[in-house]
Curated annotation (Swiss-Prot):
<feature type="active site" description="Proton acceptor">
    <location>
        <position position="13"/>
    </location>
</feature>
<feature type="binding site">
    <location>
        <position position="142"/>
    </location>
    <ligand>
        <name>IMP</name>
    </ligand>
</feature>
<dbReference type="Pfam" id="PF00709">
    <property type="entry name" value="Adenylsucc_synt"/>
</dbReference>
<keyword id="KW-0460">Magnesium</keyword>
<feature type="binding site">
    <location>
        <position position="40"/>
    </location>
    <ligand>
        <name>Mg(2+)</name>
    </ligand>
</feature>
<keyword id="KW-0963">Cytoplasm</keyword>
<dbReference type="InterPro" id="IPR027417">
    <property type="entry name" value="P-loop_NTPase"/>
</dbReference>
<dbReference type="InterPro" id="IPR001114">
    <property type="entry name" value="Adenylosuccinate_synthetase"/>
</dbReference>
<feature type="active site" description="Proton donor">
    <location>
        <position position="41"/>
    </location>
</feature>
<keyword id="KW-0547">Nucleotide-binding</keyword>
<feature type="binding site">
    <location>
        <begin position="12"/>
        <end position="18"/>
    </location>
    <ligand>
        <name>GTP</name>
    </ligand>
</feature>
<feature type="binding site">
    <location>
        <begin position="298"/>
        <end position="304"/>
    </location>
    <ligand>
        <name>substrate</name>
    </ligand>
</feature>
<dbReference type="GO" id="GO:0005525">
    <property type="term" value="F:GTP binding"/>
</dbReference>
<feature type="binding site" description="in other chain">
    <location>
        <begin position="13"/>
        <end position="16"/>
    </location>
    <ligand>
        <name>IMP</name>
    </ligand>
</feature>
<feature type="binding site" description="in other chain">
    <location>
        <begin position="38"/>
        <end position="41"/>
    </location>
    <ligand>
        <name>IMP</name>
    </ligand>
</feature>
<feature type="binding site" description="in other chain">
    <location>
        <position position="302"/>
    </location>
    <ligand>
        <name>IMP</name>
    </ligand>
</feature>
<keyword id="KW-0658">Purine biosynthesis</keyword>
Length: 430
């Protein structure tokens, strides 16, 4: 029984797809356990970029099983589109499995997402308008439609009719918006269900059977710990639990079967959307990092906010996710800077604190306390070991590990598979 969980430790976009793809080489099953198509991940294979939103990164290994777990909310329209995209690129999807217990995103979720966000005015939280939140709301309210329901024509029609009647009343009376048509949604989405039917099964059985047989299972999280609905910067968070604990709920695998948790982070910090960001940069350095790091959202295309590495955030993520290993990405983006900074603590009303406050009001008053290190000018994109890094870059990597309190297993100096350097094999250490 061998399993590894990959989680983002910041606000998403840390490079989880790349690291998952890298670790997938030694896994036999790869599974997603939460989120939806609001999260994008980019994988580079032989110099070619593939952008996925729902399907796990392991899909590029045809001999391995890729699982969309019960904790994922699935937009069938997006899924069918993504499958077609992969097929057009010559990628087989015969190895995909979708949980029959996963909940379905429907057009009324997306419309409600947009209306709710618009109604917030200046208090918007920066949702991707993908219907994720409303779908999880229906799930919690026990009125959601699951994949198993989508495949049953009569049950789907019955539940869609009830839900749509309620949502249309809400659209018309509360938001003064246009109601949606039952027949159009039913026809379109039932057809999507039939297209994905071949992939649908009880994925909890597949995952547990694989673990019981001694196979290596990799769990792939979406977003990041700081977007977790419980542990993140609430309410500027997602509607699910990206933390490692979300694996047990979102995949149907018990906590005793989790061996390692790999936290993925960048050598700096980025964030899409609104919400607290203590180390955010608004100067030329921030603009340089954004451009060199190509910091634009995979899903939204929006420019990401960028800032210095925040070890306070990282220690919070380590604690609430039980991180055992760290993967440090995008070190190359910092090349060319005279100095680099790491936030080691916050100043809150004149008091030094080393924890991440829950209160948004306190966070607004937090000022980062920085440790400044000398930068490096060399191009490090061709580096293939820690010893090949310039001394200042090497010191930066070591200092990150010290401040976070977790050993660094891999570091990356570019987006390619070959640019990921192994310091310690995660699989071998289990």
């Amino acid at each position: 029984m061998t399993s590894v969980v990959v989680v983002g430790t910041q606000w998403g976009d840390e490079g989880k797809g790349k690291i998952t793809d890298f670790l997938s080489a030694d896994a036999e099953v790869i599974a997603r356990y939460q989120g939806g198509d609001n999260a994008g991940h980019t994988i580079v294979i032989d110099g070619k970029k593939f952008k996925l939103h729902l399907i796990p990164s392991g899909i590029f290994f045809p001999q391995k099983i890729s699982v969309i777990g019960n904790g994922v909310v699935v937009n069938p329209k997006s899924l069918v589109k993504e499958l077609a995209y992969l097929h057009d690129e010559g990628v087989t999807t015969d190895n995909l499995r979708i949980s029959d217990r996963a909940h379905v995103i429907l057009p009324y979720h997306i419309q409600l997402d947009q209306l709710q966000e618009d109604a917030k005015g200046d208090n918007k939280i920066g949702t991707t308008i993908k219907g994720i939140g409303p779908a999880y709301m229906d799930k919690a309210a026990r009125v959601g439609i699951r994949i198993a329901d989508l495949l049953d024509k009569d049950i789907f029609a019955e539940r869609l009719r009830i839900n749509l009647a309620e949502k249309n009343r809400l659209f018309e009376k509360m938001y003064n918006s246009t109601p949606l048509d039952f027949d159009a949604i039913f026809e379109e989405y039932y057809a999507y269900g039939q297209e994905i039917k071949q992939y649908v099964t009880d994925t909890s059985v597949i995952l547990n059977d694989a673990l019981d047989a001694g196979k290596r299972v990799l769990f792939e999280g979406a977003q990041g710990v700081m977007l977790d609905i419980d542990q993140g910067t609430y309410p500027f968070v997602t509607s699910s639990n990206p933390v490692a604990g979300g694996v047990t709920i979102g995949s149907g695998v018990g906590p005793s079967k989790i061996n390692k948790v790999v936290g993925v982070c960048k050598a700096y910090t980025s964030r899409v959307g609104d919400g607290p960001f203590p180390t955010e940069l608004f100067d030329e350095v921030g603009e340089r990092i954004r451009e060199v790091g190509h910091e634009y959202g995979t899903t939204t295309g929006r420019p990401r906010r960028v800032g210095w590495f925040d070890s306070v955030v990282m220690r919070h993520s380590r604690r609430v996710s039980g991180i055992t290993n760290l993967s440090l990405n995008s070190i190359d983006v910092l090349s060319g800077l005279d100095t680099v900074k790491i936030c080691v603590a916050y100043d809150l009303d004149g008091k030094r604190i080393d924890y991440y406050p829950a209160s948004l009001e306190q966070l607004k008053r937090c000022k980062p306390i920085y440790e400044e290190l000398p930068g490096w000018q060399e191009d490090i994109t061709g580096v293939r070991s820690l010893d090949e890094l310039p001394e200042n870059a090497r010191n930066y990597v070591r200092r990150v590990g010290e401040l976070v309190g977790v050993r660094i297993s891999t570091f990356s100096v570019g987006p390619g598979r070959e640019q990921t350097n192994i310091l310690e094999s995660v699989w071998a250490s289990i």
